[in-house]
Amino acid sequence: MSDLESLKTSLLADIAAASDEVGIEAVRLAAMGKKGSVSELLKTLGSMTPEERQTRGAAINALKNEITEQLTAKKTELKDAAINARLKAETLDVSLPVRSSPAERGRIHPISQIVDEITAIFADMGFSIAEGPDIETDYYNFTALNFPEGHPAREMHDTFFLQPDANGERKVLRTHTSPVQVRTMEAQKPPIRIVIPGKTYRQDSDATHSPMFHQVEGLVIDKTANVGHLRWILEEFCKTFFEVDSVTMRFRPSFFPFTEPSFEVDIQCDRSSGPIVKFGEGKDWMEILGCGMVHPNVLRAGGLDPDEYQGFAWGMGLDRIAMLKYGMPDLRDFFNADVRWMSHYGFRPLDVPTLFGGLSV
């Protein structure tokens, strides 16, 4: 039995000397691996006589069990030691304030928020969202919308023209979102109820104008659409968007090439508090949008018979109504990517606006 005792002493010494998990694994393989010293002894059990199994066999199994227990205990000891060493090296001040999550630190840009608010309001009224290209043809941007030749909007001082293509046609950066109206009429049969948010481009830049700005407009086409429907939709929108119980609006006659009759819409407000305008109260008036009944020529350009269908449309500047609602003094701040400005005027990303909540909180 002296050989078993010697092996046991040697293996226990190796186990005790192991300083990490790699070392203890090497000892395990040397003892219990396929060709390990204990495994080789276990292979001899089959050739032993019954008497030998009772004595030497029992001693070999006892050696195996003890070595296995010692290996397991050493592994646990080394694992605990590694954890303790890491904890000792990693200092953590539990009195420090908890970091906010990325969702709390980030902010939604006011324009993105305004688009979400407006589309949520009109979606709850049964409207769908339509979009179109920023680079438009002269036809969709002007001709199909009843802009006559020589109209000021066709001049270089107001419109960004691209270089002529191989066919000599010059495309433009769209000056309004109205081309989507004609594209929708061509692609979809009435009834049509769409709201169209998007970027537009004009050569203008000051505290209240930008060469690139945002618009949203709506379009309704069916056989019975009228100004009464238009007024109701705009009143409901303004009450919800400006979060007031009632609004007083007035429709002033105006002119737009693509609508007839055309109106500019004013809303009653209180402008005595500086940049923040209070809607639904006061004695002041402020223009917020333009609208009208879709011109018969625009219906024809969209492939519709004006004797059978009629409709109305409205449009407004997203940047301007954002400035009005939230008291922002300078349009140029919208595009400066100032983190401090975003932290002040931005919105929490998990606050999704709907008709029933989350519009500005």
Swiss-Prot record:
Binds 2 magnesium ions per tetramer. It catalyses: tRNA(Phe) + L-phenylalanine + ATP = L-phenylalanyl-tRNA(Phe) + AMP + diphosphate + H(+). Keywords: Aminoacyl-tRNA synthetase, ATP-binding, Cytoplasm, Ligase, Magnesium, Metal-binding, Nucleotide-binding, Protein biosynthesis. Gene3D superfamilies: Bira Bifunctional Protein, Domain 2. GO terms for molecular function: ATP binding; magnesium ion binding; phenylalanine-tRNA ligase activity; tRNA binding. Mg(2+) binds at E260. GO terms for biological process: phenylalanyl-tRNA aminoacylation. Its EC number is 6.1.1.20. Pfam families: Phe_tRNA-synt_N (PF02912), tRNA-synt_2d (PF01409). Its cofactor is Mg(2+). The keyword Aminoacyl-tRNA synthetase applies. It is found in: Cytoplasm. One of its GO terms (cellular component) is cytoplasm. NCBIfam families: pheS. Tetramer of two alpha and two beta subunits. Belongs to the class-II aminoacyl-tRNA synthetase family. Phe-tRNA synthetase alpha subunit type 1 subfamily. This is Phenylalanine--tRNA ligase alpha subunit. The lineage of its organism: Bacteria, Pseudomonadati, Pseudomonadota, Alphaproteobacteria, Hyphomicrobiales.
